[in-house]
Amino acid sequence: MKKSFIHQQEEISFVKNTFTQYLIAKLDVVEVQGPILSRVGDGMQDNLSGTENPVSVNVLKIPNATFEVVHSLAKWKRHTLARFGFNEGEGLVVNMKALRPDEDSLDQTHSVYVDQWDWEKVIPDGKRNLAYLKETVETIYKVIRLTELAVEARYDIEAVLPKKITFIHTEELVAKYPDLTPKERENAITKEFGAVFLIGIGGVLPDGKPHDGRAPDYDDWTTETENGYHGLNGDILVWNDQLGSAFELSSMGIRVDEEALKRQVEMTGDQDRLAFDWHKSLLNGLFPLTIGGGIGQSRMVMFLLRKKHIGEVQTSVWPQEVRDSYDNIL
Protein backbone atom coordinates (compact mmCIF):
# COMPACT_ATOMS: atom_id res chain seq x y z
CA MET A 1 0.00 0.00 0.00
CA LYS A 2 2.81 2.42 0.89
CA LYS A 3 4.63 1.73 -2.37
CA SER A 4 1.46 2.33 -4.38
CA PHE A 5 0.78 5.58 -2.51
CA ILE A 6 4.30 6.89 -3.09
CA HIS A 7 4.15 5.99 -6.79
CA GLN A 8 0.80 7.76 -7.06
CA GLN A 9 2.27 10.90 -5.50
CA GLU A 10 5.31 10.80 -7.78
CA GLU A 11 3.04 10.62 -10.84
CA ILE A 12 1.02 13.62 -9.62
CA SER A 13 4.17 15.66 -9.00
CA PHE A 14 5.61 14.74 -12.39
CA VAL A 15 2.53 15.97 -14.25
CA LYS A 16 2.31 19.21 -12.26
CA ASN A 17 6.02 20.00 -12.51
CA THR A 18 6.20 19.17 -16.22
CA PHE A 19 3.15 21.24 -17.09
CA THR A 20 4.40 24.19 -15.01
CA GLN A 21 7.76 24.23 -16.79
CA TYR A 22 6.19 24.07 -20.25
CA LEU A 23 3.58 26.71 -19.38
CA ILE A 24 6.15 29.21 -18.13
CA ALA A 25 8.31 28.68 -21.22
CA LYS A 26 5.64 28.63 -23.93
CA LEU A 27 3.24 31.24 -22.53
CA ASP A 28 6.18 33.45 -21.48
CA VAL A 29 5.00 34.13 -17.93
CA VAL A 30 6.79 34.32 -14.58
CA GLU A 31 5.70 32.30 -11.56
CA VAL A 32 4.67 34.50 -8.61
CA GLN A 33 3.15 34.06 -5.16
CA GLY A 34 -0.56 34.72 -4.73
CA PRO A 35 -2.93 35.25 -1.79
CA ILE A 36 -5.33 32.82 -0.15
CA LEU A 37 -7.45 35.60 1.40
CA SER A 38 -9.27 38.57 -0.14
CA ARG A 39 -10.48 41.60 1.85
CA VAL A 40 -14.26 42.00 1.70
CA GLY A 41 -15.27 45.27 0.05
CA ASP A 42 -12.34 45.91 -2.27
CA GLY A 43 -13.97 44.07 -5.19
CA MET A 44 -11.03 41.72 -5.68
CA GLN A 45 -12.91 38.47 -4.99
CA ASP A 46 -13.94 36.37 -7.98
CA ASN A 47 -17.72 35.99 -7.82
CA LEU A 48 -17.69 33.11 -10.34
CA SER A 49 -21.25 32.74 -11.63
CA GLY A 50 -22.54 35.10 -8.92
CA THR A 51 -24.28 32.59 -6.63
CA GLU A 52 -21.43 30.95 -4.71
CA ASN A 53 -20.80 31.96 -1.08
CA PRO A 54 -17.12 32.25 -0.11
CA VAL A 55 -15.59 31.09 3.17
CA SER A 56 -15.47 34.06 5.56
CA VAL A 57 -12.43 34.57 7.80
CA ASN A 58 -11.93 36.99 10.70
CA VAL A 59 -8.34 37.88 11.57
CA LEU A 60 -7.76 38.59 15.27
CA LYS A 61 -5.26 41.40 14.78
CA ILE A 62 -7.25 43.09 11.99
CA PRO A 63 -10.61 43.52 13.75
CA ASN A 64 -11.97 46.21 11.42
CA ALA A 65 -11.95 43.99 8.32
CA THR A 66 -13.40 40.71 7.13
CA PHE A 67 -11.65 38.42 4.69
CA GLU A 68 -12.74 35.63 2.35
CA VAL A 69 -10.90 32.61 1.04
CA VAL A 70 -10.42 33.30 -2.66
CA HIS A 71 -12.49 31.58 -5.34
CA SER A 72 -9.82 32.42 -7.91
CA LEU A 73 -7.34 35.23 -8.54
CA ALA A 74 -8.94 36.64 -11.70
CA LYS A 75 -9.06 40.23 -10.45
CA TRP A 76 -5.99 40.07 -8.19
CA LYS A 77 -3.79 39.13 -11.15
CA ARG A 78 -4.84 42.12 -13.23
CA HIS A 79 -4.34 44.43 -10.27
CA THR A 80 -0.87 42.95 -9.74
CA LEU A 81 0.15 43.40 -13.38
CA ALA A 82 -0.78 47.09 -13.05
CA ARG A 83 0.81 47.52 -9.63
CA PHE A 84 4.22 46.25 -10.72
CA GLY A 85 4.21 47.72 -14.21
CA PHE A 86 4.20 44.63 -16.40
CA ASN A 87 4.64 45.50 -20.07
CA GLU A 88 2.72 44.34 -23.14
CA GLY A 89 3.20 40.63 -23.76
CA GLU A 90 4.40 39.99 -20.21
CA GLY A 91 2.49 38.01 -17.64
CA LEU A 92 2.39 35.90 -14.51
CA VAL A 93 1.16 32.55 -13.24
CA VAL A 94 0.20 31.59 -9.69
CA ASN A 95 -0.02 28.14 -8.12
CA MET A 96 -3.49 28.96 -6.82
CA LYS A 97 -5.34 27.16 -4.02
CA ALA A 98 -8.97 27.98 -3.28
CA LEU A 99 -12.11 26.73 -1.56
CA ARG A 100 -15.52 26.61 -3.22
CA PRO A 101 -17.86 25.09 -0.61
CA ASP A 102 -20.97 25.90 -2.65
CA GLU A 103 -20.16 23.43 -5.44
CA ASP A 104 -23.60 22.07 -6.28
CA SER A 105 -22.24 18.53 -6.54
CA LEU A 106 -19.23 16.67 -5.18
CA ASP A 107 -18.61 14.07 -7.84
CA GLN A 108 -15.92 12.61 -10.10
CA THR A 109 -14.92 16.02 -11.44
CA HIS A 110 -15.98 18.56 -8.78
CA SER A 111 -14.34 19.18 -5.41
CA VAL A 112 -14.53 21.79 -2.65
CA TYR A 113 -10.76 22.16 -2.97
CA VAL A 114 -9.60 23.93 -6.13
CA ASP A 115 -6.03 24.06 -7.38
CA GLN A 116 -5.14 25.68 -10.66
CA TRP A 117 -2.51 27.42 -12.69
CA ASP A 118 -3.98 30.94 -12.52
CA TRP A 119 -2.34 33.05 -15.24
CA GLU A 120 -2.69 36.54 -16.71
CA LYS A 121 -0.90 38.50 -19.47
CA VAL A 122 -0.90 42.08 -20.70
CA ILE A 123 -2.32 42.13 -24.23
CA PRO A 124 -0.01 43.59 -26.90
CA ASP A 125 -1.24 46.77 -28.57
CA GLY A 126 -3.97 46.15 -31.13
CA LYS A 127 -4.51 42.51 -30.16
CA ARG A 128 -7.63 42.68 -28.01
CA ASN A 129 -9.46 40.45 -30.47
CA LEU A 130 -10.60 36.93 -31.29
CA ALA A 131 -7.45 36.09 -33.25
CA TYR A 132 -5.25 36.74 -30.22
CA LEU A 133 -7.58 34.70 -28.01
CA LYS A 134 -7.26 31.76 -30.40
CA GLU A 135 -3.49 32.18 -30.63
CA THR A 136 -3.24 31.99 -26.84
CA VAL A 137 -5.54 28.96 -26.68
CA GLU A 138 -3.32 27.17 -29.19
CA THR A 139 -0.26 27.91 -27.05
CA ILE A 140 -1.90 26.46 -23.95
CA TYR A 141 -3.14 23.44 -25.89
CA LYS A 142 0.42 22.84 -27.09
CA VAL A 143 1.53 22.79 -23.45
CA ILE A 144 -1.16 20.23 -22.65
CA ARG A 145 -0.06 18.00 -25.54
CA LEU A 146 3.63 18.29 -24.66
CA THR A 147 2.83 17.25 -21.11
CA GLU A 148 0.74 14.33 -22.35
CA LEU A 149 3.64 13.15 -24.51
CA ALA A 150 6.00 13.41 -21.52
CA VAL A 151 3.59 11.29 -19.46
CA GLU A 152 3.42 8.75 -22.29
CA ALA A 153 7.21 8.51 -22.43
CA ARG A 154 7.61 8.12 -18.67
CA TYR A 155 4.62 5.98 -17.69
CA ASP A 156 3.61 4.31 -20.96
CA ILE A 157 0.15 5.91 -20.90
CA GLU A 158 -0.91 6.28 -24.53
CA ALA A 159 -1.38 9.86 -25.76
CA VAL A 160 -4.88 10.43 -27.15
CA LEU A 161 -5.22 14.15 -27.83
CA PRO A 162 -5.47 15.38 -31.45
CA LYS A 163 -2.68 17.58 -32.79
CA LYS A 164 -5.01 20.54 -33.22
CA ILE A 165 -7.78 22.00 -31.09
CA THR A 166 -11.10 22.84 -32.78
CA PHE A 167 -12.74 26.24 -32.27
CA ILE A 168 -16.52 26.65 -32.19
CA HIS A 169 -18.81 29.41 -30.94
CA THR A 170 -21.64 28.70 -28.52
CA GLU A 171 -24.05 30.22 -31.07
CA GLU A 172 -22.86 27.68 -33.65
CA LEU A 173 -23.25 24.88 -31.14
CA VAL A 174 -26.84 25.70 -30.21
CA ALA A 175 -27.70 25.90 -33.93
CA LYS A 176 -26.01 22.55 -34.57
CA TYR A 177 -27.71 20.80 -31.64
CA PRO A 178 -30.93 22.76 -30.92
CA ASP A 179 -32.59 19.92 -29.02
CA LEU A 180 -29.68 19.20 -26.66
CA THR A 181 -28.83 20.75 -23.30
CA PRO A 182 -25.57 22.74 -23.02
CA LYS A 183 -23.80 19.78 -21.40
CA GLU A 184 -25.10 17.41 -24.07
CA ARG A 185 -23.86 19.82 -26.77
CA GLU A 186 -20.41 19.83 -25.18
CA ASN A 187 -20.38 16.04 -25.13
CA ALA A 188 -21.44 15.77 -28.77
CA ILE A 189 -18.92 18.25 -30.19
CA THR A 190 -16.01 17.12 -28.00
CA LYS A 191 -16.56 13.45 -28.77
CA GLU A 192 -16.45 14.33 -32.47
CA PHE A 193 -13.23 16.36 -32.40
CA GLY A 194 -11.38 15.21 -29.25
CA ALA A 195 -10.39 18.72 -28.15
CA VAL A 196 -12.51 21.86 -28.46
CA PHE A 197 -12.34 25.51 -27.44
CA LEU A 198 -15.90 26.67 -26.91
CA ILE A 199 -16.08 30.44 -27.50
CA GLY A 200 -18.51 32.87 -25.89
CA ILE A 201 -19.75 31.69 -22.50
CA GLY A 202 -21.96 33.93 -20.38
CA GLY A 203 -24.18 35.75 -22.84
CA VAL A 204 -27.73 34.84 -23.80
CA LEU A 205 -27.88 32.60 -26.89
CA PRO A 206 -30.54 32.53 -29.64
CA ASP A 207 -32.49 29.94 -27.62
CA GLY A 208 -32.93 32.54 -24.87
CA LYS A 209 -30.48 31.05 -22.37
CA PRO A 210 -26.73 31.36 -21.74
CA HIS A 211 -24.55 28.31 -22.33
CA ASP A 212 -23.32 28.72 -18.76
CA GLY A 213 -23.05 31.48 -16.17
CA ARG A 214 -20.14 33.90 -15.91
CA ALA A 215 -19.55 36.85 -13.60
CA PRO A 216 -19.87 40.21 -15.40
CA ASP A 217 -16.57 41.72 -14.29
CA TYR A 218 -13.70 39.60 -15.50
CA ASP A 219 -14.24 37.82 -18.86
CA ASP A 220 -15.66 39.77 -21.81
CA TRP A 221 -18.59 37.66 -23.01
CA THR A 222 -20.52 40.37 -24.87
CA THR A 223 -18.20 41.97 -27.44
CA GLU A 224 -19.21 41.09 -31.00
CA THR A 225 -16.48 39.18 -32.83
CA GLU A 226 -17.39 37.63 -36.20
CA ASN A 227 -20.53 36.57 -38.06
CA GLY A 228 -22.68 38.15 -35.38
CA TYR A 229 -21.18 35.96 -32.66
CA HIS A 230 -20.32 37.36 -29.24
CA GLY A 231 -17.72 36.78 -26.57
CA LEU A 232 -13.96 36.82 -26.16
CA ASN A 233 -13.80 33.98 -23.66
CA GLY A 234 -14.33 30.24 -23.51
CA ASP A 235 -13.47 26.79 -22.18
CA ILE A 236 -10.92 24.20 -23.27
CA LEU A 237 -12.72 20.85 -23.41
CA VAL A 238 -11.25 17.42 -24.11
CA TRP A 239 -12.95 14.06 -24.54
CA ASN A 240 -12.43 11.90 -21.46
CA ASP A 241 -12.75 8.20 -22.22
CA GLN A 242 -12.65 7.30 -18.53
CA LEU A 243 -15.83 9.29 -17.93
CA GLY A 244 -17.38 9.00 -21.37
CA SER A 245 -17.96 12.75 -21.52
CA ALA A 246 -16.46 16.14 -22.31
CA PHE A 247 -14.01 17.31 -19.66
CA GLU A 248 -13.20 20.96 -18.95
CA LEU A 249 -9.51 21.64 -18.38
CA SER A 250 -9.51 25.43 -18.51
CA SER A 251 -11.71 28.50 -18.48
CA MET A 252 -10.12 31.63 -19.91
CA GLY A 253 -10.69 34.80 -21.84
CA ILE A 254 -9.86 38.35 -22.75
CA ARG A 255 -10.85 40.49 -19.78
CA VAL A 256 -13.41 43.28 -19.75
CA ASP A 257 -12.42 46.78 -20.74
CA GLU A 258 -14.33 49.81 -19.43
CA GLU A 259 -17.17 49.51 -21.93
CA ALA A 260 -17.62 45.75 -21.56
CA LEU A 261 -17.65 46.06 -17.77
CA LYS A 262 -20.38 48.71 -17.80
CA ARG A 263 -22.39 46.77 -20.37
CA GLN A 264 -22.18 43.46 -18.54
CA VAL A 265 -22.95 44.67 -15.01
CA GLU A 266 -26.02 46.40 -16.43
CA MET A 267 -27.11 43.17 -18.10
CA THR A 268 -26.74 41.18 -14.87
CA GLY A 269 -28.03 43.89 -12.54
CA ASP A 270 -24.71 44.18 -10.71
CA GLN A 271 -24.12 47.93 -11.13
CA ASP A 272 -23.39 48.16 -7.39
CA ARG A 273 -20.03 46.50 -8.03
CA LEU A 274 -18.85 49.65 -9.81
CA ALA A 275 -18.48 51.25 -6.37
CA PHE A 276 -15.67 48.85 -5.41
CA ASP A 277 -12.08 50.10 -5.55
CA TRP A 278 -11.07 47.47 -8.11
CA HIS A 279 -13.86 48.41 -10.49
CA LYS A 280 -13.20 52.14 -10.07
CA SER A 281 -9.56 51.52 -11.00
CA LEU A 282 -10.61 49.74 -14.17
CA LEU A 283 -13.08 52.46 -15.14
CA ASN A 284 -10.40 55.10 -14.54
CA GLY A 285 -8.01 53.39 -16.94
CA LEU A 286 -5.53 52.24 -14.29
CA PHE A 287 -5.43 48.60 -15.39
CA PRO A 288 -3.86 47.21 -18.57
CA LEU A 289 -5.88 45.23 -21.10
CA THR A 290 -5.31 41.60 -20.21
CA ILE A 291 -6.08 38.00 -21.08
CA GLY A 292 -6.09 35.28 -18.47
CA GLY A 293 -7.63 32.18 -17.03
CA GLY A 294 -7.35 29.17 -14.81
CA ILE A 295 -6.12 25.70 -15.75
CA GLY A 296 -7.24 23.01 -13.33
CA GLN A 297 -4.24 21.23 -11.82
CA SER A 298 -6.07 18.23 -10.37
CA ARG A 299 -8.20 17.99 -13.49
CA MET A 300 -5.10 18.00 -15.69
CA VAL A 301 -3.48 15.29 -13.58
CA MET A 302 -6.69 13.27 -13.50
CA PHE A 303 -7.00 13.41 -17.28
CA LEU A 304 -3.37 12.70 -18.17
CA LEU A 305 -3.07 9.81 -15.69
CA ARG A 306 -6.46 8.43 -16.83
CA LYS A 307 -8.04 8.49 -13.37
CA LYS A 308 -11.78 8.08 -12.86
CA HIS A 309 -12.18 10.41 -9.86
CA ILE A 310 -10.55 13.73 -9.01
CA GLY A 311 -10.14 12.46 -5.44
CA GLU A 312 -7.48 10.06 -6.73
CA VAL A 313 -5.13 13.00 -7.38
CA GLN A 314 -6.00 15.50 -4.62
CA THR A 315 -6.78 15.37 -0.91
CA SER A 316 -10.20 16.87 -0.23
CA VAL A 317 -13.43 16.13 1.64
CA TRP A 318 -16.06 13.74 0.32
CA PRO A 319 -19.35 12.21 1.44
CA GLN A 320 -18.85 8.73 2.87
CA GLU A 321 -20.73 7.14 -0.01
CA VAL A 322 -18.17 8.60 -2.43
CA ARG A 323 -15.29 7.17 -0.40
CA ASP A 324 -17.04 3.81 -0.31
CA SER A 325 -17.40 3.82 -4.10
CA TYR A 326 -13.75 4.53 -5.02
CA ASP A 327 -10.87 2.57 -3.50
CA ASN A 328 -8.09 4.98 -4.48
CA ILE A 329 -9.42 8.28 -3.11
CA LEU A 330 -6.68 10.03 -1.16
UniProtKB/Swiss-Prot annotation:
Which keywords does the record carry? Amino-acid biosynthesis, Asparagine biosynthesis, ATP-binding, Cytoplasm, Ligase, Nucleotide-binding
- Enzyme nomenclature, EC number: 6.3.1.1
- Write down the Pfam families for this protein, in alphabetical order: AsnA
- Supply one GO molecular-function term: aspartate-ammonia ligase activity
At the top of the EC hierarchy, this enzyme's class is ligase
Record-annotated membrane-spanning stretches: none
User: Which BP terms from GO are recorded?
Assistant: L-asparagine biosynthetic process
Principal place of residence: cytoplasm
Q: Report the GO terms under cellular component.
A: cytosol
Task: Give the source's domain of life in one word.
Answer: Bacteria
Can the keyword rRNA-binding be found in this entry's annotation? no
Q: Which residues form a coiled coil?
A: none
Pathway field: Amino-acid biosynthesis; L-asparagine biosynthesis; L-asparagine from L-aspartate (ammonia route): step 1/1
Q: Which PANTHER family match?
A: ASPARTATE--AMMONIA LIGASE (PTHR30073:SF5)
What is the designated name of this protein? Aspartate--ammonia ligase
Which species does this protein come from? Streptococcus pyogenes serotype M3 (strain ATCC BAA-595 / MGAS315)
